[in-house]
Structure formats: structure tokens, C-alpha cells
Amino acid sequence: MTFEERIKLPTNMEEWKIRKQYLKSIVRDIFEENKIEYKENVTFNNGLFADFYNEQHCLAVEVCDFASHCSSKKILDFERIGDKQPYTNWQKANELGIRLICAYENEILDQKKYFVFKNMIQYQCGIFHRVFARNTKVEIIPALKMKPFYEANNIQGYRNAKTAFVLKDKKTEEPLMCYTIGAAYFGKGMYDCEIARGACVINYHNTGIGIQVVAGASKLWKHILEYGETHNPDGTPGRINSIVYYTDNRYYDGRSIGHLMDSGFESGKVETLATTPGFMNFWDNIEENPETHRGKLKNREPARHTLITQGYRNGNILCIPNAGTTTHVYIRDGIELRNEKTN
């Protein structure tokens, strides 16, 4: 396969057909190289469609090209999709107990993101090296030091945070898993902290296979709660009584959230706050686009709101909706959240 730094939209339906088949071949190769059984073009009783489906491991994959997954403009022969359609698909998958992974073309054609995407399929199908948390230790360091780790092992890369909790192999000292924490953006001051991002090694000792750290999440969670008894997210003296945690619905179903308290360290509760659809913006190949954006899919950018709105109107910027995020919160027992949000 050939990786692409910038995406170009097809100019006619024949180009689109060739493009779509190419994207599907990339995903198909992952299944076949790992000897994972699959069916193609499956429609379930509730209307959910999957380009690929593995019944044994309850895994569905949808290949999302931009031309047929745009909500702001009619492209070629495709009608605009609804802003909530990917979110609705995610709900349908959950109803069936299926994990739906969305294969966006910019990600499976990206040299770094492709391998993280591949690992998602492998992991769901039980293809991983098992490591036990008892053979690891937790190290607390500034979050920025883990940026290379996230760039290699998380499909979204690194996100700004304050403190990293790193699970390391006791013998080799190599980092295996990490959670970072920082100020909570959700709730505008109602919550003390958020898990900014998590990641696990996706290419253990250059085997092309990632790892599962048995009891790793609960071990990291235990240390975060201990740390939060006397510290703020940035390490200054304080206390963390509430922690927000996000699930990216484009790839995950959130089932692991219920196991965060398995360590039994401290009582408290984990609740689901909200599940909201999302979207990103595809900056088409036009002259007025900034060079850093042309041919790329970007997150929301409030500073460019006027330019983006204009781009929607003239069709030079496309809205690509997605399944969004589910937001959870942990609250220590006996704690009442602040009633008034702070700015």
C-alpha cells in the first residue's frame, strides 16, 4: 500500500469506485494477514451496515471515504448524509453487542495511524501479547515526556496534559501503557480533572502485535486516585475528587469503563454524563486553504470559525460527521459536585 499525506477527492464515480475498492483492500488485508475470518457487505436486522464483519469477536468495520460520508455537500452521485448518521450506526452496533470500528480514509492511509488501526482489529480478535500488571510498576512523570509514546501508539496522537502515569516493565523499564491527566474541559469547572488520553504499546518488541496488560487499567487508576488525594492534576498541592474520562465512539464501545474500579482501592462511582455526535472538517485542495490544512481532516478550530463557515457555504470545506464521544465521570464517595460552573 502507499501512504498519503493529503487526501484528494475523486472527480467522477469511476474514480470513486476504484478508490473505495482500494480502501477496502487495505482493511481486507489486515483480516487476511492475521487469519481472521470475515464476511463482507453485511446488513444486520436493525439496518446497520458493515463493510467487514467477524461474528466470533463481535467486530464490524465500516470504511469511511469522504465523498460518501459528507453531510455539508452533495458529492458526485451521493446525497448528503445526516449529521447524526454515524452516531446512529454506533448506537445500532451497541444494540447488537458489536464493536464498530470506523476506518476513515485519512487514517488508514496515514503511515502512523494505519498501524494503530490495524492493532484495534488485532486486539478485538484476541491477537496480542499478554502482560500481567504484577510484573509492572507505575512511574509518574510530566505528560509531555510521553508525547513520542502517544504519537506511536494512539490514533489521535498526543493531547496536551499535565501529568503522565506510566506502566513500565519492572525488568526492562520499557513503557507499556500510559494515562495522562490534566484540567477538565468538560463541564466548565464542575470537575477537577480529566483523563486526557490513554495508550498501550501496539508493536511489542517489533512483532507487529500489541499487548494486553491484564489489570493494567485498574492499576493505573488506583495510582491516579492515590495521587489525587494530595495533588492537583498539575502536581501542585490539592485534591482531585472528580475525574472525567472520554470514550471515542469511532473506535470503541466503552465496555471497559465498568472495570476501572476493579482495584478496590477506594469507593466511588463511575457515571455516564453524555454521549454526543461529533464531526471534523475536510479542507479540500483549494488555493485559499492554509498549506497546513490542504487535503487534510481537521478538528474544530474556533479561531477559524469565519473561514470554516464560508468554506461550508462554497463547498471548499466539507463537514465529515462521526460517532462522537461518550463522557464518563468518577466521583469520590461523599463528594457533591459544585452547583455553579466557573468560567
Question: Which residues fall in each region the model found?
Answer:
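Acidic, metal-coordinating catalytic cores used for nucleic-acid/nucleotide bond scission
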Residues: 19, 44-46, 67-81, 107-111, ...
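Short beta-strand-loop-alpha-helix junction that forms the active-site gateway
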Residues: 43-86, 182-187, 200
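Short hydrophobic/aromatic beta-strand or adjacent loop that forms the aromatic wall/cage
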Residues: 49, 162-164, 324-329
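A conserved beta-strand-loop-helix scaffold within acyl/acetyltransferase catalytic domains
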Residues: 128-232, 238, 248-250, 258, ...
